[in-house]
A protein has these predicted regions:
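Helix-loop-beta segment of a Rossmann-like dinucleotide-binding subdomain
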Residues: 9, 93-103, 115, 128, ...
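Helical element adjacent to the flavin cofactor pocket in flavoenzyme catalytic cores
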Residues: 147-203, 207, 211-214, 387-400
Length: 406
C-alpha cells in the first residue's frame, strides 16, 4: 500500500469508512456543502445499515434525556425535527406518536421530575401526568406518575440510510472490508480492502461504528477508548393491542441505557426491549457468536474490568433477564401488568457500540476526534440515528476543513 501514494492519483477527495446512517449522512452532507467533492463510502456488508442503524427500536428521540448543552442534547433536538422533515420529503415511513416515561417506584419520582426540568432546558414540551391520567394515553400501562413527550416518533432508519446513500451522489462500495490503512500526512491515505483493491483519498472519515476504534488504530491515531459491545435483546409482543404508542421506564442515570421499553413501530408491531448484556463479539447478536480475538481485546482493556467492578449488580440482573424469559417478563410487567411470558416472541437483537475509557468511564456524549487527514467518530450510539443529520454535517465540516488545509 505504501508505494501507491507516491503517484498521487487519488480515487476520491474523502473516503468514508462505514455505510451506516452516520457514514451515509456524512457523505450526503459533504456533497451538499461542497458540490463536486468526490466521496467514496466503503461498507463491508452487502448493503447499508446492517448493524446499529438497522437493529434498534426505530425511535426518533426528542432529546429529553441528555445533558443540556451536550452534543447529544443539541443534535437530538435538532435532528428529530430534521428527521421528520427528511422522511416527509422523501416519502419514508414515519410517525410522530409522542411517548410516555413512567415512574413505577417512589424512588423514581425525583428522577422523573428531573427529566421534566431537563426537557424544559432543552426546549422540549412535556406534560406531567398523575397515575389516573396515564390511561388517557395507555389504558394498559400502570405507574405512579408519568410525563408525556409529544415530539418523539418512529421511523424507518434503514429507509433513511438508503435515501441518504442515493441522494449523496457518493460512490458506495459494498462488500469492501478494510484490511489495512496507510496514512502519510504529507500525501494522503491509502486503504486496502479484503478484495485486494486500493482506494486512495486525500482525507479519511471513520464512521465504522462497532469497529471505529480498530479503524482509528489502523490509521495510526490512538483513540484512547475501546468499543465494548453490549447486546440489546428484543421481543415482539404477540398482543400488540396492549400498547398504543411508546412507553419507557425512568432511566437509571448511572448508565447510558434507557431500560426495557415498549415501542409501536411503523409496521404496527410492538417491540419490547432492549436489555444490555456484554456481547462476546463485536457483532455478537446472540450468545452463540463468540470471537476469541475480539473478546480477548475487550477483556484486556482495563476499562472493561472497572465496569464489571462498579456495575456487577446491574449486570447480573441484565444477565438473568437475558437467560430467562420469565425474568424479562417480570421487568416488563412493571409497566404493562397484563403481559405474560407467552406474549413475548423473540426478535432480532442489536449490539450497541459503547465507547469505554481506560478508567471504566462509559462515554456519555457523542465523541468525534481528529488526526492528520482523518476524522474519527468514536462514540455514536443512541440517539445517533435521530441525530444523524446534524452529526453528519459536523463530521463533514471537519473533513472539508481538513481537505482545504492539505
Amino acid at each position: 500500500v505504501v508505494q501507491v501514494l507516491s503517484g498521487i492519483a487519488y480515487d476520491c477527495d474523502v473516503l468514508v469508512i462505514g455505510g451506516g446512517i452516520v457514514g451515509l449522512s456524512t457523505a450526503y452532507a459533504i456533497t451538499r456543502a461542497a458540490p463536486g467533492t468526490r466521496v467514496v463510502v466503503l461498507e463491508k456488508e452487502a448493503g447499508p445499515a446492517r448493524h446499529q442503524t438497522g437493529r434498534n427500536s426505530g425511535v426518533i428521540h426528542s432529546g429529553i434525556y441528555y445533558r443540556p448543552g451536550s452534543l447529544k442534547a443539541r443534535y437530538a433536538v435538532r435532528g428529530a425535527a430534521e428527521m421528520v422533515k427528511f422522511c416527509a420529503e422523501y416519502g419514508i415511513a414515519h410517525a410522530v406518536t409522542g411517548k410516555l416515561i413512567v415512574a413505577t417506584e417512589r424512588d423514581e419520582l425525583p428522577r422523573l421530575h428531573g427529566l421534566v426540568q431537563r426537557g424544559r432546558e432543552n426546549g422540549i414540551p412535556v406534560r406531567e401526568l398523575g397515575a389516573a391520567q396515564i390511561a388517557e394515553y395507555e389504558p394498559e400501562v400502570e405507574g405512579l406518575a408519568a410525563i408525556h413527550v409529544g415530539t418523539t416518533g418512529v421511523c424507518d432508519f434503514v429507509g433513511v440510510a438508503r435515501q441518504l446513500a442515493e441522494a449523496s451522489g457518493a460512490e458506495i462500495r459494498y462488500g469492501a472490508e478494510v484490511r489495512r490503512i496507510d496514512r502519510r500526512p504529507e500525501l494522503g491515505v491509502a486503504v486496502l480492502t479484503g478484495a485486494g483493491d486500493v482506494v486512495r483519498a486525500r482525507v479519511l472519515v471513520n464512521c465504522a461504528g462497532l469497529h471505529c476504534d480498530e479503524i482509528s488504530r489502523m490509521t495510526g491515531d490512538d483513540p484512547e477508548m475501546r468499543i465494548v459491545p453490549f447486546r440489546g435483546e428484543y421481543y415482539t409482543l404477540a398482543r400488540p393491542e396492549l400498547v398504543r404508542g411508546l412507553v419507557y421506564p425512568v432511566p437509571d442515570p448511572a448508565f447510558p441505557f434507557l431500560g426495557v421499553h415498549l415501542t409501536r413501530g411503523i409496521d404496527g408491531g410492538v417491540h419490547i426491549g432492549p436489555n444490555a448484556v456484554p456481547a462476546l463479539a463485536r457483532e455478537g447478536y446472540d450468545w452463540g457468536v463468540v470471537r476469541p480475538r475480539e473478546l480477548g481485546a475487550t477483556l484486556a482493556w482495563p476499562g472493561s474490568w472497572q465496569i464489571a467492578r462498579r456495575h456487577w449488580r446491574y449486570g447480573a440482573g441484565e444477565l438473568r433477564r437475558s437467560l430467562s424469559r420469565g425474568a424479562f417478563t417480570t421487568a416488563v410487567r412493571r409497566l404493562l401488568p397484563a403481559v405474560t411470558a407467552d406474549d413475548l416472541v423473540p426478535a432480532a437483537a442489536g449490539v450497541r457500540a459503547q465507547a469505554v475509557l481506560r478508567d471504566g468511564t462509559l462515554v456519555d456524549d457523542f465523541l468525534i476526534k481528529e488526526g492528520a487527514r482523518a476524522v474519527h467518530v468514536l462514540n455514536a450510539p443512541s440517539p445517533a440515528a435521530t441525530a444523524s443529520l446534524p452529526i453528519g454535517r459536523e463530521v463533514a465540516r471537519r473533513a472539508l476543513e481538513s481537505l482545504r488545509s492539505v
